[in-house]
């Protein structure tokens, strides 16, 4: 128990595999669940004062945490998940579930968020990665975000300053952490929005191995190619290392089929990169983030 942070939900030596989509990850020294910005500021101020590292994990949907875990503080925004509407502007805290947020937009007959209706993760992670699917991406509707700097300052970043690119945003370099974001939506027809979301979710269910733990799409799309196609052409569908294998359903996904570890994921990613490059001459670049310490 850290007496200076009394009243905040903090768990010591907590295995992170219970909180990641891959179901892998070693322990965090301290796993914190702030309920508001004040508690978040207290955690960051304490960590900075004690020279302890800290990071925000988000919903960990496109992330692999190594088996040795993470030192210092890991902060999760599960309790910072409010969503508000002001006219056609939707504002969501970073911990808000992305899929649930798209449902709120649909309920109010607001269009623009349909592309994200099946993307797992949080609002904060979606902004960080400029998440996208089926021709849409966060940058198309993004207005601004409140972020927490490494020094503990809260500031607002505009769409221009976010410098979005393919699965990229400026905060990947600055280290700023999204705590809330605003999006510009448009009035639409509820039935039309609902039908489009149903169509996209049906496509996702047909093509993606949603029944297994995974980190989503593992690799960025190489120019002029599709990662899944290159992996399939290299005869890697079903290839397995430890408990992790390349999905038979979609070669761009790696699934945890038998108590796999983060090392299994890393070894399989490295093997796929090398094999695909030898086969096609194209070097795949991971989209998934890998953090933490090895055992």
Swiss-Prot record:
Catalytic activity entry: UDP-N-acetyl-alpha-D-muramate + NADP(+) = UDP-N-acetyl-3-O-(1-carboxyvinyl)-alpha-D-glucosamine + NADPH + H(+)
Pathway in which the depicted protein is active: Cell wall biogenesis; peptidoglycan biosynthesis
GO biological process entries: cell division; cell wall organization; peptidoglycan biosynthetic process; regulation of cell shape
Record-listed E.C. numbers: 1.3.1.98
Active site: 167, 217 (proton donor), 287
Domain FAD-binding PCMH-type: 23-188
A GO CC term attached to the entry: cytosol
Cofactor(s) this protein requires: FAD
Keyword Cytoplasm carried by entry: yes
Cross-referenced InterPro entries: FAD-bd_PCMH, FAD-bd_PCMH-like_sf, FAD-bd_PCMH_sub1, FAD-bd_PCMH_sub2, MurB, MurB_C, MurB_C_sf, Oxid_FAD_bind_N
UniProt keyword terms in alphabetical order: Cell cycle, Cell division, Cell shape, Cell wall biogenesis/degradation, Cytoplasm, FAD, Flavoprotein, NADP, Oxidoreductase, Peptidoglycan synthesis
Leader peptide range in chain numbering: none
Keyword Disulfide bond on entry: no
One Pfam family named in its UniProt record: MurB_C
Role according to the record: Cell wall formation.
Similarity annotation: Belongs to the MurB family.
Protein name: UDP-N-acetylenolpyruvoylglucosamine reductase
Organism: Streptococcus pyogenes serotype M5 (strain Manfredo)
């Amino acid at each position: 128990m850290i007496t200076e942070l009394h009243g905040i939900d903090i768990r010591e030596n907590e295995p992170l595999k219970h909180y990641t989509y891959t179901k892998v990850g070693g322990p965090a020294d301290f796993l914190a669940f702030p309920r508001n910005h004040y508690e978040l500021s207290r955690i960051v101020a304490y960590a900075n004062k004690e020279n302890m590292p800290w990071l925000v994990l988000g919903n960990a949907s496109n992330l692999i945490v190594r088996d040795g875990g993470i030192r210092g503080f890991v902060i999760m925004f599960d309790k910072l998940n409010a969503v508000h509407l002001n006219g056609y502007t939707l504002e969501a805290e970073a911990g808000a579930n992305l899929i649930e947020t798209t449902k709120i937009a649909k309920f109010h007959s607001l269009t623009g968020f349909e592309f994200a209706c099946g993307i797992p993760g949080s609002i904060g992670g979606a902004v960080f990665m400029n998440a996208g699917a089926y021709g849409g991406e966060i940058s198309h509707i993004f207005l601004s975000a409140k972020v927490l700097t490494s020094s503990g300052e809260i500031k607002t970043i505009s769409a221009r300053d976010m410098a979005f690119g393919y699965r990229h945003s400026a905060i990947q370099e600055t280290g700023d952490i999204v705590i809330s974001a605003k999006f510009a939506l448009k009035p639409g027809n509820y039935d039309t929005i609902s039908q489009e979301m149903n169509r996209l979710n049906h496509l996702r269910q047909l093509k993606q191995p949603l029944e297994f733990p995974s980190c989503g799409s593992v690799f960025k799309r190489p120019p002029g190619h599709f990662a899944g196609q290159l992996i399939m052409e290299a005869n890697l569908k079903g290839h397995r290392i430890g408990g992790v294998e390349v999905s038979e359903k979609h070669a761009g996904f790696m699934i945890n089929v038998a108590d796999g570890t983060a090392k299994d994921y890393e070894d399989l990613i490295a093997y796929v990169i090398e094999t695909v490059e030898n086969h096609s001459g194209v070097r795949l670049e991971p989209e998934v983030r890998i953090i933490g310490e090895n055992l």
